[in-house]
Amino acid sequence: MTDNSNIRVVVGMSGGVDSSVTALLLKEQGYDVIGVFMKNWDDTDEFGVCTATEDYKDVAAVADQIGIPYYSVNFEKEYWDRVFEYFLAEYRAGRTPNPDVMCNKEIKFKAFLDYAMTLGADYVATGHYAQVTRDENGIVHMLRGADNNKDQTYFLSQLSQEQLQKTLFPLGHLQKPEVRRIAEEAGLATAKKKDSTGICFIGEKNFKDFLGQYLPAQPGRMMTVDGRDMGEHAGLMYYTIGQRGGLGIGGQHGGDNKPWFVVGKDLSKNILYVGQGFYHDSLMSTSLTASEIHFTRDMPNEFKLECTAKFRYRQPDSKVTVYVKGNQARVVFDDLQRAITPGQAVVFYNEQECLGGGMIDQAYRDDKICQYI
């Protein structure tokens, strides 16, 4: 067996089962393991209990069980400046942001990585479901997690080669039920803890109420694309392209019973556009433009790429052709795509490898801009 005792791995521990098992596996493999809890948000639940305090207790319990030192580090300022301000700015611009992508890029694999280096880390590790492999030239390739349902490469697509060189994903080859089983067999304190869902800083709170604390809502008109007034919307920031619920209009308005969907936003006039039918014509597009294009390894400044892409998490891959120029790209779809959403990530794949991605700016239908923003 390889002697890993001189290799120090600092594990980002959230108090959940995935990061707990990550630390356990590395310890069993003989690494010099340190656990670190990141406090990124000052939060209390509906009972006034600080959720971070409870999570830190779980980290402490697991670290004691497996016999590793542990620390807590506060990244609230970094998180506010680099993730939350971005989140609010995107909503102000009428877009639908993906804070998880930015959190991984700026906090978990930047602020945390920098902190881990001060602890003498050779690597950092997290409980993400992704895999890394190193080729004969020392280049690290990021591959999808073996559990298709849990694969998180979509959220890791903005990581750089430098970040990946320093990263381990010990759960990448495992299925989620196996991770639970390992935790239960080891008797870990977090073995039966349920997974966290949703945006970390919102938690179980009502999204509309939460956003309204930071951005003033501006109600306006809700219209069909052919100009019929359908009533009032609560504020463009509360709606996302392709959304069905929360519109307050039934099928009767259209003379048929098809459900209504958000099909566009006009930020300058504060109009929310709606249409009937899941595959409403205004929701379908043939291409998109994206910025902040980034690849996990060095690529030319300008090139054409035929690959597959995801436009949202847990979506099946779609065949695309990508025309890259600097940090901008035009992505042309082989087949019509529904509800391409500005602000979300577009992520590129070559079979199992995640190549990188960018942030969606606009969707197009045959070179005509769609009803967005």
Curated annotation (Swiss-Prot):
InterPro entries referenced in this protein's UniProt entry, alphabetically = MnmA-like, MnmA-like_C, MnmA-like_central, MnmA-like_central_sf, Rossmann-like_a/b/a_fold
The active site consists of 103 (nucleophile), 200 (cysteine persulfide intermediate)
Per the UniProt entry, the disulfide pairs are: 103-200
Q: What GO molecular-function term can you cite, just one?
A: tRNA-uridine 2-sulfurtransferase activity
Query: Could you say which residues are annotated as the site Interaction with tRNA?
Result: 128, 344
Q: Does the keyword RNA-binding apply?
A: yes
Swiss-Prot/TrEMBL catalytic activity: S-sulfanyl-L-cysteinyl-[protein] + uridine(34) in tRNA + AH2 + ATP = 2-thiouridine(34) in tRNA + L-cysteinyl-[protein] + A + AMP + diphosphate + H(+)
| Keywords per UniProt | ATP-binding, Cytoplasm, Disulfide bond, Nucleotide-binding, RNA-binding, Transferase, tRNA processing, tRNA-binding
Can you say where in the cell this protein is located?
Cytoplasm
Taxonomically, the superkingdom here is: Bacteria
Q: What is its EC number?
A: 2.8.1.13
- Provide the residue positions that the database annotates as binding ATP: 12-19, 38, 127
- Coiled coil region boundaries: none
Give me the ranges of the annotated region Interaction with tRNA. 150-152, 312-313
HAMAP family (alphabetical) = tRNA_thiouridyl_MnmA
Protein name in UniProt: tRNA-specific 2-thiouridylase MnmA
Q: Organism source for this protein? A: Streptococcus agalactiae serotype V (strain ATCC BAA-611 / 2603 V/R)
